[in-house]
C-alpha cells in the first residue's frame, strides 16, 4: 500500500518508489501494487504509481469502495494482458463473480462523469475529518506526550501513546464517549 496505507496513513516517498521499481525490474520480481486509498489525497496527488514505472511487470489494484460506496465491494486491476486469464481464474475461484448490478452502477457513474465530480467532494470531506481528528488529538492527547502521524491523504491516523498509557484500558472509555479505535 504505497498511498496512505492502513494503519499508519503514511505514503511511500518518491525515492522509495523508484528504488522498489528499479529492484523489481532488475530482479524480475513482479510488483503487486494495492492502492485502495490512492485517490484520497488532500492537497497534492501522490507520486506516480509503482506500476506505471514497469507496466509489464506489475499489477495495479484499485477500489471503488473507498471513493464511491463501501457496500459495492468493487475494485479493478491493471495488468499485462498476458496475465488476464490467470487473474480471471483466481477471481472466479475466490467468489465466482461480482454482482452485475454493482458493476453496472459503477460503469454508469464513470460514464456520466459523476465519479469525476464526486471524488473531489470525498477528498474534501476526508480532509475535514482528518483536520478535526488532528485538532482533537492535539487538544486531548497533546499534553500526554502522545505522537501521531499527519496524513496527507486516506483515512488513517497512527497514534503512539506514551508507555504509561495502555491502549487496551483506554478503549472502553473511548467507546463510552462515543468513539472507537483499534488498539
Region spans (language model):
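PLP-dependent class I/II
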Residues: 1-183
Amino acid at each position: 500500500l504505497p498511498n496512505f496505507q492502513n494503519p499508519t496513513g503514511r505514503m511511500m516517498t518518491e525515492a522509495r518508489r523508484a528504488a522498489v521499481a528499479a529492484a523489481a525490474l532488475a530482479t524480475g520480481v513482479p510488483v503487486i501494487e494495492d492502492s485502495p486509498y490512492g485517490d484520497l489525497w488532500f492537497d497534492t496527488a501522490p507520486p506516480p504509481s509503482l506500476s506505471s514505472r514497469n507496466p509489464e511487470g506489475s499489477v495495479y489494484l484499485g477500489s471503488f469502495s473507498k471513493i464511491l460506496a463501501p457496500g459495492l465491494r468493487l475494485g479493478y486491476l491493471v495488468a499485462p494482458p498476458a496475465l488476464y486469464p490467470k487473474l480471471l481464474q483466481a477471481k472466479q475461484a475466490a467468489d465466482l463473480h461480482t454482482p452485475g448490478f454493482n458493476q453496472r452502477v459503477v460503469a454508469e457513474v464513470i460514464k456520466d462523469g459523476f465519479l469525476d465530480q464526486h471524488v473531489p467532494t470525498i477528498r474534501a470531506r476526508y480532509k475535514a475529518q482528518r483536520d478535526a481528528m488532528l485538532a482533537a488529538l492535539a487538544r486531548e492527547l497533546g499534553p500526554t506526550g502522545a505522537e501521531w502521524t499527519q496524513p496527507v491523504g486516506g483515512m488513517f491516523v497512527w497514534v503512539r501513546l506514551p508507555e504509561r498509557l495502555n491502549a487496551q484500558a483506554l478503549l472502553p472509555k473511548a467507546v463510552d464517549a462515543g468513539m472507537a479505535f483499534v488498539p
